[in-house]
């Protein structure tokens, strides 16, 4: 966080930014470990705790999820599994290819709002 402008941007836009650590959970509830319920922690416990401790706008239209690398995977996984919770999702350097692999993501492969910034930077004139 200290090497980015996230805090300044969040402050200017009156946003709450939460960065949870999900270990090597793949953002999934462990079947045999009741204390390792990562999906529930992020989709149930965390929003409840935020609403309890901060004055926030209610409703999915005010909630998004985002992540970098493995966190990007978790963000898209949870957003697709819980579309009632999130109105937007951001994936930065996430381990996925929305144009070829996942049928649930393929519907956005031709969406003009989806931009592959890595390809754009690599081939800006194409």
Give the residues covered by each predicted segment.
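Non-catalytic cap/lid and distal C-terminal segments of serine-dependent acyl enzymes
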Residues: 1-126
């Amino acid at each position: 966080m200290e090497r980015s402008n996230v805090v300044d941007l969040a402050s200017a836009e009156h946003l709450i930014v939460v960065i949870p650590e999900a270990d090597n959970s793949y953002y999934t509830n462990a079947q045999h470990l009741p204390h390792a319920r990562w999906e529930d922690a992020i989709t149930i416990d965390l929003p409840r705790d935020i609403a309890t401790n901060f004055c926030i706008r209610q409703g999915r239209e005010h909630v998004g999820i985002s992540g970098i690398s493995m966190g990007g995977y978790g963000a898209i996984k949870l957003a697709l599994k819980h579309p009632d919770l999130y109105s937007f999702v951001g994936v930065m350097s996430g381990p996925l290819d929305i144009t070829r692999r996942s049928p649930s993501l393929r519907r956005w492969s031709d969406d003009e709002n989806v931009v592959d910034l890595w390809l754009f930077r690599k081939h800006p004139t194409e």
